[in-house]
């Protein structure tokens, strides 16, 4: 038994809760619906790790203390092959002295962003309020403990998860008796509901002292972190991981094929899917929700579609729009025109204005191929991009680039093998995923030779 408490929210909650329960984790603040499905007890203690879906729904953000977070990530990487783990270089909710210039704030070699308040380059105290690929900063400084948060406005607030009127009244009265720094108030967290009053008083006193000390230290400090927050790691899910989570969820409740992929496609599709699965739960019908979405929204031949190329460091590279020349699920052919001159990276052949790129892709394939032609139709070469299984959405195709590639011109060669090895050393991907990518590259190279 790990005795690590995890709070899970978002579109992956049901499947991840089941997975983590089976791995021996303790689930905190579980929703009533999921508690009923899994028959797990309510636990209102403070979680060691917080999990919620990323802002783009293509994975999860995990936040917590180093040891608990590392154990959770090790379990996920051991059981799901195509995940990428990207640690943030700043700590979520951490307090920093920064140097602001037009909304871009130097936190000590790492940059965060906030609304530009003008006035040129100035030093200020900021907090990492959110991380969406980049740190988003706020000047509204909060101080968090296990049971209470000191908030930069007066008054007493209580977590909406504390429902009992007697508990709320008791916490409100307790808050009125406590002394906090000027212009600050108290927000009681859910875990305060079951904690003894003495412990709550001690935490408020401790946080108040730390807050006063921080404002004093800030004046003479250099740019950098003044108070730690929580470690933040973004975990990107590939297609295989979503399919495995579908399987876990389907063993609990009726789940449409490609449920988590569809959920990650946007709120409108997610809402329609919820209605569809309610019907699926009550009636015996053929499950083809994704086919209906394709028929209504695409992709469709002659339409434009985006190519979303996700790097292992989390950057999303938009390769531009391509025309769908052919589509019969799961096969698709795209065409793009080249503007500008130069040299094609990897192929080392001339790039000319007016060249045509023909991209052939199959959903769930571990590679995507780009074929290059001159304006007159002369073949120049092919670039086989090894990636996580490709996903089709109505307006885009998506995959995670696995660094290693195969190129074919007058000869066939594998490139960037060393770059993939470095990603394993950096712990962005597992050894197992790297081995899968290398095996696919070697298989393709042999077929093409």
Question: Which residues are covered by each model-predicted region?
Answer:
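Charge-rich, low-complexity N-terminal segments
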Residues: 262-344
């Amino acid at each position: 038994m790990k005795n690590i408490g995890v709070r899970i929210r978002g579109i992956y909650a049901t499947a991840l809760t089941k997975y983590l329960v089976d791995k021996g984790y303790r689930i905190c603040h579980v929703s009533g619906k999921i508690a009923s499905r899994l028959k797990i007890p309510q636990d209102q203690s403070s979680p060691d790790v917080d999990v919620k879906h990323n802002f783009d729904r293509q994975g999860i953000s995990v936040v917590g203390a180093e040891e608990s977070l590392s154990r959770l990530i090790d379990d996920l990487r051991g059981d799901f092959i195509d995940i990428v783990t990207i640690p943030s270089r700043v700590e979520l909710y951490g307090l920093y002295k920064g140097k602001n210039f037009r909304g871009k704030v130097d936190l000590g070699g790492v940059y965060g962003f906030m609304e530009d308040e003008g006035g040129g380059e100035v030093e200020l105290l900021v907090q990492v309020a959110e991380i969406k690929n980049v740190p988003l900063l706020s000047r509204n400084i909060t101080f968090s403990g296990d049971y209470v948060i000191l908030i930069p406005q007066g008054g007493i607030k209580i977590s909406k998860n504390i429902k009992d009127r007697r508990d709320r009244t008791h916490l409100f009265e307790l808050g009125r008796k406590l002394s906090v720094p000027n212009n600050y108030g108290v927000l009681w967290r859910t875990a305060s509901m079951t904690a003894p009053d003495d412990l709550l008083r001690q935490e408020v006193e401790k946080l108040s002292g730390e807050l006063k000390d921080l404002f004093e230290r800030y004046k003479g400090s250099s740019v950098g972190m003044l108070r730690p927050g929580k470690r933040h790691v973004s975990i990107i899910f590939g297609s295989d991981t979503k399919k495995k989570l579908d399987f876990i969820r389907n063993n609990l409740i009726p789940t449409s094929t490609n449920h988590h992929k569809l959920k990650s496609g946007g709120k409108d599709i997610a809402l329609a899917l919820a209605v569809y699965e309610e019907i699926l739960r009550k009636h015996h019908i053929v499950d083809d929700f994704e086919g209906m979405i394709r028929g209504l929204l695409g992709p469709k031949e002659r339409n434009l579609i985006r190519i979303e190329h996700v790097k292992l460091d989390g950057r999303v590279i938009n390769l531009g729009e391509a025309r769908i020349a052919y589509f019969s699920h799961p096969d698709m052919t795209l065409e793009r025109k080249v503007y500008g001159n130069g040299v094609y990276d990897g192929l080392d052949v001339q790039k000319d204005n007016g060249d045509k790129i023909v991209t052939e892709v199959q959903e769930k394939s571990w590679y995507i191929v780009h074929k290059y032609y001159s304006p007159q139709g002369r073949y120049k070469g092919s670039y086989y991009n090894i990636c996580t299984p490709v996903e089709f959405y109505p307006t885009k195709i998506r995959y995670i680039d696995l660094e290693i590639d195969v190129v074919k011109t007058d000869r066939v060669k594998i490139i960037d093998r060393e770059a993939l090895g470095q990603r394993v050393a950096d712990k962005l991907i597992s050894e197992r995923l790297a081995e899968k990518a290398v095996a696919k590259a070697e298989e393709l190279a042999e077929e093409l030779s």
